[in-house]
């Protein structure tokens, strides 16, 4: 297991390096000069040149990357051009906000979707299967931002059950914090539950067709025993992998939900930084998300043998 973990970590290093180079190059292809943007249209060429020199933008791309990546290896993501704050501190602070939403949504979706998918497979082509698959397909087809707006309109503006927009830290007031996070969590939950139900159903159907399941039924075992002892564990492996991918994808794509509900999370920070041409923050956000994505997949790979004995044997 240790060798497997070390091999995965070694494989992640070139991935992160490629991400770092790609992020560095792509954001510099975005039109606009950060120095000009900060100083405004009335700035003189001399003041713009001076600010570019202080920000290191007058150097070649290779020199800029070497300096930036050298600092990254020391845990220093630089300073924000617009706010002057430490990028590492800013990114981590906003990440904690986003992580609350993503983890809660994925956990709730998994707890509901996996049993629902198993039931749909067990009752294939009967009304429970048709209802669950139809609901899952509908939820997947609705764009996240539109789903968020519908919830905001219905639960917030019409029924007044939940706060419409804003954020309160759970550390300051856990009751108010949960109320403000409820709609963002519900939005992601409803969208991702459809994906997980379909995956769990497909995995369970594949396992139900295998010979050892037929043999277990022929031995007279109850359907409950067959499903729990022979189907669930073997069908959960692919779903477990998908849960990890969903977790990583949500963290990288949560900007839409955070924008709709004005949540000060990592996605909102990235969007604001892009509009402000804040290179250090953009680079820090994207590199951090990539690192978390790689870490999540590493954890998924390490725990996968628990659900597939064949992988553990290998």
Which residues make up each language-model segment?
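An internal, D/E-rich "acidic patch" concept
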Residues: 58-114
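Alpha-helical transmembrane segments of integral membrane proteins
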Residues: 2-3, 95-128, 144, 157, ...
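Hydrophobic alpha-helical transmembrane segments of membrane transport/permease proteins
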Residues: 15-66, 159-180
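N-terminal signal-anchor/signal peptide hydrophobic helix marking the start
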Residues: 6-12
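Membrane-water interface segments at the C-terminal ends of transmembrane alpha-helices
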Residues: 22-29, 59, 70-71, 134-165, ...
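Short amphipathic alpha-helical coupling elements at transmembrane boundaries
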Residues: 3, 40, 50-53, 67, ...
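Hydrophobic alpha-helical transmembrane segments of multi-pass integral membrane proteins
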Residues: 17-22, 61, 103-107, 150-151, ...
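Short, membrane-interfacial amphipathic segments enriched in basic
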Residues: 1-2, 58, 62-63, 74-88, ...
